[in-house]
């Protein structure tokens, strides 16, 4: 089981969605959660350090989730950070693009708490967390 003190960054331009994900994480025992409203905001926070997991939307202003993912993977200090994409983009080509860019997992909105928990556990297991 993953460390319950693991620090999450939830990235979504829609504040209600950030709150939903934060509350679901809280239900799963993860209380160390911060938020960012787009990829640029997220990048600034991530570069300050201390985060152990990113949950990001795809469609956002300034820097979308795919660009954020590519930037994280290209940065030596952050390249191993797990990134779960949570998005309304359900098209096969989007899922493939996210996988090719290095997404740790992919969840299509709307989703249940059970789906989020299952994806997180798969990522934790794969990373030995």
Swiss-Prot record:
Free-text remark on how the cofactor is bound: Binds 1 Mg(2+) ion per subunit.
Chain ranges of the Response regulatory domain: 7-124
Residues that bear N6-acetyllysine: 92, 109
Main location: cytoplasm
Matches recorded under Pfam families: Response_reg
GO MF term set: metal ion binding
Protein name: Chemotaxis protein CheY
Source species of the chain: Escherichia coli O6:H1 (strain CFT073 / ATCC 700928 / UPEC)
Taxonomic lineage of the native organism: Bacteria, Pseudomonadati, Pseudomonadota, Gammaproteobacteria, Enterobacterales
Gene: cheY
């Amino acid at each position: 089981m993953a460390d319950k003190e693991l620090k999450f960054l939830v990235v979504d331009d829609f504040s209600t969605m950030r709150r939903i994900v934060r509350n679901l994480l809280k239900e799963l025992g993860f209380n160390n959660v911060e938020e960012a409203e787009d990829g640029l905001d997220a990048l600034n926070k991530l570069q300050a350090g201390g985060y152990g997991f990113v949950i990001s939307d795809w469609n956002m202003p300034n820097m979308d989730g795919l660009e954020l993912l590519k930037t994280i993977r290209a940065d030596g200090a952050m390249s191993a950070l797990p990134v779960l994409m949570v998005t309304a983009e359900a098209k096969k080509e989007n899922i493939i693009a996210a996988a090719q860019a290095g997404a740790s997992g992919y969840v299509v909105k709307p989703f249940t708490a059970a789906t989020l928990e299952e994806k997180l556990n798969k990522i934790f297991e794969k990373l030995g967390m």
